[in-house]
């Protein structure tokens, strides 16, 4: 049946029995396809019926449907004519794992950073009103943690004050509300329905009513208090108190019930909340059995078991996690903060070992950073573990709440540099540029597992300002020993005997292995290369100037944007020191990159060791070294 769905219009004639059959087929399709490619399986299994209902009730793309945390759009893609492309999911030139405007007119925004959909919806509804397009609804689907982000509530505050037709679908899969709201409300609702509770309540009612004169009055008073407490904790009041109409809660796996609720909401003609309760991982045993994450995001798996088809080697994240636990075991002042991602950032084990020292603040990076500042003011040393790309959201807090106060907060930036298959929104290629302008911050980029452990320890010993460590996604690789330590920097290679000191190659973090491969190629051409790892890449160490004066050319190699990165900082530092050596930056161009593997992107950007060696050889030749173009090609090909 799925093969017959070319667009939302094909859903309109289906019966309820056919819709149930289609939902089952979609789930089987999801498991089969995502098992092969990897991707966000659990969230999409949970929104099958909801997405079917959305496309039956609303006229996409005339009525924009905006998915917050865009990883829950796989079913939306299937229903808008892209099911045949799922073999290429998250692969170069294939289907994006997030909404993509270039793929379909049904994808309005390329959303992947959480809590933004309501603001998009607010703006779109205003634009439609100003353009006289009053017959267009805007639908925003939030949930999967997005409502823990403050931006959602800022948008709700504005939407509620309007009369524009914005339909907000809250996908409540158990991860949408903060525990003090959703957890207590759900607990009371379950408790009230338990037979044992009802029996106790019945006996208590009889006892109280039996008291002479005041019994009946006391009973009604106690019943009113109980009802008031329950109502005050109800999710509905979160929204109705803002002036929003509310429909629900609705069983999100009953397509007909969801459809009825959405049609009712569409008829209001103003802002309305539709509260839909779903189960992440619905219909797939291994996902439902994964209590921690419901298989939120997976690598390629065996669909029969849910187990990974390839065992990963030791990873950067695991290395960090183990080291942090080791340091925290020796120091009670070390605490950790995560923005709703304890598993992906390696903090789950930390929380199990030190449950009172891990703080999951939800998708609230701004709050995470200023809360860390408060912890530091109180004598703690907080470690904020966060994806590099999400650090952008907390820039003002890092600058004004942490750095201005010279507070010892350590930021650990996972997924730095090119991450690949998650696409342009997840590459961590701006952190060095952003952090480089913050006064007093120190930034380390470990090249291997040993250096990660060492530099984390060094960061935790800093007590007069913020620090940051950055490392990429994936396996950590072999350790790279240093030949010597010089002025706090590691020298990894020196010119071979008989060669001049032609090039000083400064390697940033995990690109040290590439730098050594480049140096080997250049040595084979008679170009002498010194390779150093500064360890702490920002601010620029004074010792770099001392090394630079002994070379003809300084080249920086980094997986950050070349604008404002380490290369820019090194060039500026050498100019300030009036060191006249030539400088060149090798890094990422200032643009957004489509999804592909890390290796494919580096090859496309000419950031392989062969490409970099060819560029450096050309620069050396331009400075007067006797290397011909023919020799360059002969040795590099």
Curated annotation (Swiss-Prot):
Reactions mediated catalytically: D-glyceraldehyde 3-phosphate + pyruvate + H(+) = 1-deoxy-D-xylulose 5-phosphate + CO2
Enzyme Commission (EC) number: 2.2.1.7
Top-level taxon: Bacteria
Residues binding Mg(2+), per UniProt: 144, 173
Keywords carried by this UniProt record: Isoprene biosynthesis, Magnesium, Metal-binding, Thiamine biosynthesis, Thiamine pyrophosphate, Transferase
Cofactor(s) recorded in Swiss-Prot or TrEMBL: Mg(2+); thiamine diphosphate
Cofactor stoichiometry and binding remark: Binds 1 Mg(2+) ion per subunit. Binds 1 thiamine pyrophosphate per subunit.
Pathway of action: Metabolic intermediate biosynthesis; 1-deoxy-D-xylulose 5-phosphate biosynthesis; 1-deoxy-D-xylulose 5-phosphate from D-glyceraldehyde 3-phosphate and pyruvate: step 1/1
GO molecular function: 1-deoxy-D-xylulose-5-phosphate synthase activity; magnesium ion binding; thiamine pyrophosphate binding
Key word Magnesium present: yes
InterPro entries: Dxylulose-5-P_synthase, THDP-binding, Transketo_C/PFOR_II, Transketolase-like_Pyr-bd, Transketolase_BS, Transketolase_C, Transketolase_CS
One GO cellular component term noted in the UniProt record for this chain: cytosol
Keyword Ribonucleoprotein: no
Complex formation: Homodimer.
Function: Catalyzes the acyloin condensation reaction between C atoms 2 and 3 of pyruvate and glyceraldehyde 3-phosphate to yield 1-deoxy-D-xylulose-5-phosphate (DXP).
Protein name: 1-deoxy-D-xylulose-5-phosphate synthase
């Amino acid at each position: 049946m799925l093969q017959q769905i070319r667009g939302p219009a094909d859903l309109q004639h289906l019966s309820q029995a056919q819709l149930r059959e289609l939902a089952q087929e979609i789930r089987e399709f999801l498991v089969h396809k995502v098992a092969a490619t990897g991707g966000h399986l659990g969230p999409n299994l949970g929104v099958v019926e909801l997405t079917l209902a959305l496309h039956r009730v609303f006229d996409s793309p005339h009525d924009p449907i905006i998915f917050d945390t865009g990883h829950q759009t796989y079913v939306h893609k299937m229903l808008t004519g892209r099911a045949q492309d799922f073999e290429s999911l998250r692969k170069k030139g294939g289907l994006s794992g997030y909404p993509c405007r270039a793929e379909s007119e049904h994808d309005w925004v390329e959303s992947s950073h959480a809590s933004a959909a309501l603001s998009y919806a607010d703006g779109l509804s205003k634009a439609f009103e100003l353009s006289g397009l009053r017959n267009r609804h805007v639908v925003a689907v939030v949930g999967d943690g997005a409502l823990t982000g403050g931006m959602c509530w800022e948008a709700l505050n504005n939407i509620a004050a309007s009369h524009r037709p914005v339909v907000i679908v809250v996908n409540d899969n158990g991860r949408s509300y903060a525990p003090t709201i959703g957890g207590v409300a759900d607990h009371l609702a379950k408790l009230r329905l338990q037979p044992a509770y009802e029996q106790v309540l019945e006996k208590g009612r009889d006892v109280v009513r039996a008291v002479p004169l005041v019994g009946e009055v006391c009973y009604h008073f106690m019943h009113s208090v109980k009802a008031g407490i329950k109502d005050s904790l109800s999710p509905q009041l979160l929204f109705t108190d803002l002036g929003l109409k509310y429909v629900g809660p609705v069983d999100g796996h009953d397509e007909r019930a969801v459809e009825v609720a959405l049609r009712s909401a569409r008829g209001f003609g103003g802002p309305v909340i539709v509260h839909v309760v779903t189960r992440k991982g619905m219909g797939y045993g291994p996902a439902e059995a994964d209590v921690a994450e419901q298989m939120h995001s997976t690598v390629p798996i065996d669909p029969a078991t849910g187990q990974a088809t390839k065992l990963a080697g030791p990873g950067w994240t695991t290395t960090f996690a183990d080291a942090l636990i080791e340091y925290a075991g020796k120091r009670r002042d070390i605490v950790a903060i995560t923005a709703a991602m304890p598993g992906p950032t390696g903090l789950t084990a930390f929380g199990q070992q030190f449950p009172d020292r891990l703080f999951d603040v939800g998708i609230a990076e701004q709050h995470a950073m200023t809360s860390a500042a408060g912890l530091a003011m109180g004598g703690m040393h907080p470690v904020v573990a966060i994806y590099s790309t999400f650090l952008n959201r907390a820039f003002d807090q890092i600058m004004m709440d942490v750095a201005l106060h010279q507070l010892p907060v350590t930021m650990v930036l996972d997924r730095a540099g090119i991450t690949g298959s998650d696409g342009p929104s997840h590459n961590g290629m701006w952190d060095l540029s952003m952090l480089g302008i913050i006064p007093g911050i120190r930034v380390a980029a470990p090249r291997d597992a040993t250096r990660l452990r060492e530099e984390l320890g060094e960061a935790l010993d800093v007590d007069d300002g913020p620090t940051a460590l950055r490392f990429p996604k994936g396996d950590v690789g072999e350790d790279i020993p240093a030949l010597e330590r010089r002025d706090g920097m590691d020298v990894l290679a020196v010119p071979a005997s008989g060669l001049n000191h032609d090039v000083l190659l400064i390697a940033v973090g995990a690109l040290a292995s590439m730098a050594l491969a480049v140096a080997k190629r250049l040595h084979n051409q008679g170009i002498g290369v010194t390779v150093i790892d500064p360890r702490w890449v920002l601010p620029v160490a004074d010792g770099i100037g001392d090394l630079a004066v002994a070379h003809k050319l300084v080249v920086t190699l980094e997986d950050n944007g070349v604008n404002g990165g380490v290369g820019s900082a090194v060039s500026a530092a050498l100019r300030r020191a009036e060191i006249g050596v030539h400088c060149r930056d090798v890094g990422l161009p200032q643009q957004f990159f489509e999804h592909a593997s890390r290796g494919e992107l580096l090859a496309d950007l000419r950031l392989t060791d062969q490409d970099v060696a060819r560029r450096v050889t050309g620069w050396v030749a331009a400075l007067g070294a006797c290397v011909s173009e023919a020799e360059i090609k002969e040795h590099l090909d």
